[in-house]
């Protein structure tokens, strides 16, 4: 390694190439060996030699690529999508998720970009401006240090959606990622991240992966949707009966039902509730249909 390169993770595992130049490798077999991650590259060292994957050529970490039954039998692996339309699969057994988190950190930590927070709050567009910021990734959150001295924490399991767009930012058109999450697990907001296409692709991989975990349709009544829309707009759970002109017992019953279907979560036994990512997605869709 050069003086500017340092080791981030090092372990034993297995790896294979699932896609080469855009073509699925149906006969691919796992190779056992050493897997090393530095701040500049991933090194895959096996009995057949050593392979280097420069981090600058990583486009993102995608979903499963079960090109054959041998691959499908492995429950946990990281799919590394490269710029040459190739995909490498890496598995470190029980340490795979930790490796994936460290890889995202190596790709994104201390990256400077422009952030608008909150761009949307409770469904209402704000007049906030884009500011310079730096980001840091760990296993549970994306931390954003703003140039004005403030900090924004995006809990990864709280991401409701991550939508790629192209917007004008300070006079230039840039790739922008619109990320829906909450502030203090309470108010729904959207934070906009503007950066170069390479960083945007990797950040989208991270946040889309988390957002997909909260997807799933739930059949709700119109009254239940009204309750969700009120919560989404920032109305306190204690204020719902008066705000919607409903009986307290009826609201309590709706809260019970929405907790059961994993749309709300209980905060205190006094029946204070807060929206989960699935609930925010449903409420947002219902508002758009109004």
From Swiss-Prot:
It comes from the Archaea. It holds the Pfam family CheF-arch. Disruption phenotype: Mutants are unable to switch the direction of flagellar rotation. Flagella rotate only clockwise, resulting in exclusively forward swimming cells that are unable to respond to tactic signals. Keywords: Chemotaxis. GO terms for biological process: chemotaxis. The keyword Ligase does not apply. Coiled coil: none annotated. Interacts with chemotaxis (Che) proteins as well as flagella accessory (Fla) proteins. Involved in taxis signal transduction. Essential for the ability to control the direction of flagellar rotation. May have a role between CheY and the flagellum. This is Taxis protein CheF1.
């Amino acid at each position: 390694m050069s003086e500017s390169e340092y080791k981030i993770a090092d372990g034993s595992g297995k790896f294979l190439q699932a896609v080469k130049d855009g073509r699925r490798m149906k006969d691919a077999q796992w190779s056992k060996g050493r897997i090393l991650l530095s701040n500049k590259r991933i090194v895959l060292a096996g009995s057949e030699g050593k392979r280097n994957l420069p981090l600058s050529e990583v486009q993102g970490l995608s979903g499963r690529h079960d090109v054959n039954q041998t691959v499908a039998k492995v429950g946990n692996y990281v799919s590394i999508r490269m710029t040459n339309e190739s995909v490498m699969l890496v598995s470190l057994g029980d340490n795979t998720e930790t490796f994936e988190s460290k890889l995202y950190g190596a790709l994104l930590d201390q990256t400077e970009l422009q952030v608008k927070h909150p761009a949307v709050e409770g469904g209402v567009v704000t007049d906030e401006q884009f500011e310079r910021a730096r980001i840091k990734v760990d296993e549970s959150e994306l931390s954003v240090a703003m140039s004005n001295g403030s900090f924004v924490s995006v809990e990864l399991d709280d991401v409701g959606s991550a939508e790629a767009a192209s917007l004008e930012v300070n006079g230039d058109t840039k790739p922008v990622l619109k990320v829906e999450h909450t502030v203090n697990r309470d108010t729904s907001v959207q934070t906009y991240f503007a950066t170069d296409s390479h960083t945007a692709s990797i950040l989208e991989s991270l946040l889309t992966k988390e957002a997909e975990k909260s997807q799933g349709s739930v059949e709700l009544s119109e009254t239940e949707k009204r309750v969700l829309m009120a919560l989404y707009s920032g109305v306190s759970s204690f204020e719902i009966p008066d705000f919607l002109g409903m009986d307290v017992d009826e609201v309590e019953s709706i809260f019970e039902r929405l907790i059961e279907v994993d749309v709300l979560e209980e905060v205190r036994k006094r029946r204070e509730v807060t929206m989960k990512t699935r609930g925010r997605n449903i409420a947002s869709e219902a508002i758009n249909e109004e």
